[in-house]
Amino acid sequence: MTDGNLSTSMNGVALMGILDGRQGDSLQDLQHLSIKAAPRSLSVPEYGPSLKLGALEDRHSLQSVDSGIPTLEIGNPEPVPCSVVHVKRKQSESEIVPERAFQSACPLPSCTPSAPTCSEREQVVRKSSTFPRTGYDSVKLYSPTSKALSRSDNVSVCSVSSLGTELSTTLSVSNEDILDLMVTSNSSAIVTLENDDDPQFTDVTLSSINETSDLHQQDCVAETEEGRKLKLLHPFSHFFTRNLLARKQNARLDRQRDLGWKLFGKVPLRETAQKDSKKTQKEYEDKAGRPSRPPSPKQNVRKNLDFEPLSTTALILEDRPANLPAKPAEEAQKHRQQYEEMVLQAKKRELKEAQRRRKQLEERCKVEESIGNAVLTWNNEILPNWETMWCSKKVRDLWWQGIPPSVRGKVWSLAIGNELNITHELFDICLARAKERWRSLSTGGSEVENEDAGFSAADREASLELIKLDISRTFPNLCIFQQGGPYHDMLHSILGAYTCYRPDVGYVQGMSFIAAVLILNLDTADAFIAFSNLLNKPCQMAFFRVDHGLMLTYFAAFEVFFEENLPKLFAHFKKNNLTADIYLIDWIFTLYSKSLPLDLACRIWDVFCRDGEEFLFRTALGILKLFEDILTRMDFIHSAQFLTRLPEDLPADEVFAAISTVQMQSRNKKWAQVLSALQKDSREMEKGSPSLRH
């Protein structure tokens, strides 16, 4: 191939590929472009038969072949050194022309460079100029044989992928067609032209610069080896050119195409095409006609955490996109007013919620402050002088407000007392007996305890099984008394030790809740002492020993004060035959620890330790008074269900406010006097209706 002259005034457009006609064909006269010798030329290494290149007649611009396509001025493209043009022509029988590639740097040099040597030709990196994205021009070429083409020049573009990405373009060129390409300025092209008897297809693959440069270095070595083999296989050169070598080229192009992973037929964006989010936002604001303001460092800082309307951050008033018709002025004003109304309502809701939270916080701070002051009062004034101050009005008022949790266990122990004189050593003895009994029952041992002679092994075994069952159902929401919990063994020890301490009472359902509340506020031994003395009280002993006559006496006394304080609800219950034992048994057995929230139950226990069993029935009347309006509209079934399963969110202040309105006097008789009178009148007690009219 001889050196061809190409003018430097092509505005950055370089020739990318040459297609030779078959032998015997002639080139037609070019209509738009003639190539002739010029003093300034681009030196192309000679690898095969000479191929003459002419200069462009128009040195300033290129014109489109189709008059319907506007002619665009093309600026000098940036040098892209990785575009390779592969040219293959049909081999004649007398010569073997291997597949070659030539280079052209971009922009074109102003002077004719010297021809490279053989070694330089082998080491040189093949490059080709790339057209700008807006360039679209037709180029017509001479063949080395000065013969005219038999058909008019045309180009058929089969498929072009989206610009700005890795392009994969397929051009269909006939035997005498020429190439007209449109290439982006930031892509490189690998063009393979074949001139055979078969219908010819030209594959143009545009890839990134870095990927193409690596492949060309591998292609140079492969092409050199292919050319050397073709010279040795002269008779079969046409066969290898059409099949084997083309297959290798196709494999190489497939490898080129596989470099980019395609999802649903779309080529992913290159790293260089990714834009910054800030730049994209700025471009959008410029298109929308709003000037972009630099973000302030204080822009995202909320001045007032309490009254900032958080809900409005997800509600943004935006104009329509630039590609859509603008809103009418009336519609835009209407939308803005609606937006402002929504923001105003959101601010009101946020303000109301913030005020509620602030009020709760203030109340909590007041409660914590009062608890702190109460702790100091209990520790410094009351507990050191317990015997003289526990019945004073000041202490009783503090008691009603609730004992601080830090001193609650100590106050409970002092208020319950230790009339049974139980010591820690006695607790250890009872616990050891309980463990020995558990072991003997598990191994099936004989009865060796003389004191347990009146109790069968079946009763003791049933009692132990009942303890195990009740422990699993004690405060299940806390998950601290169940198997594996931190207080499981302590609760099991107290209940087991009590069954050994009072075998005549044994274990009764409901004891586990009382023992659990004591464990939460006392040590194990102190909890056992308080538990034993508490169950020794007359009311608890009557219920846990299931003294039916005495239990009816307590129910009758309760109905006396029930009728005195809530006559309307009392008559409604009488009408529906709803007796007190339906709801009182569970409340008295567990001391409200199962029926009410734990915090509220502890406050009830505080006053119960001060006032005794009277406060248990007063609390029952307070609960009935709190829900009097609801209960009067219920029938028997719904009333029983409601009272046996009270709401879980009962506020302590409302409950104690209702309790404070209950008067525990009936005809100038207090609770103790009424209960004593009922115990004396056993006959009236058996009828179930107390008679206090004498």
Swiss-Prot record:
The modification Phosphoserine is found at S92, S296. It comes from the Eukaryota. It is found in: Golgi apparatus, cis-Golgi network; Golgi apparatus, trans-Golgi network. Keywords: Golgi apparatus, GTPase activation, Phosphoprotein. Residues 272-305 are annotated as: Disordered. The keyword Phosphoprotein applies. One of its GO terms (molecular function) is GTPase activator activity. It holds the Pfam family RabGAP-TBC. One of its GO terms (cellular component) is Golgi apparatus. Residues 402-612 form the Rab-GAP TBC domain. Residues 272-289 have a biased composition (Basic and acidic residues). Interacts with ULK1. May interact with RAB11A and RAB11B, but does not exhibit any GTPase-activating activity toward these proteins. Interacts with TRAPPC8. Plays a role in the regulation of starvation-induced autophagosome formation. Together with the TRAPPIII complex, regulates a constitutive trafficking step from peripheral recycling endosomes to the early Golgi, maintaining the cycling pool of ATG9 required for initiation of autophagy. This is TBC1 domain family member 14.
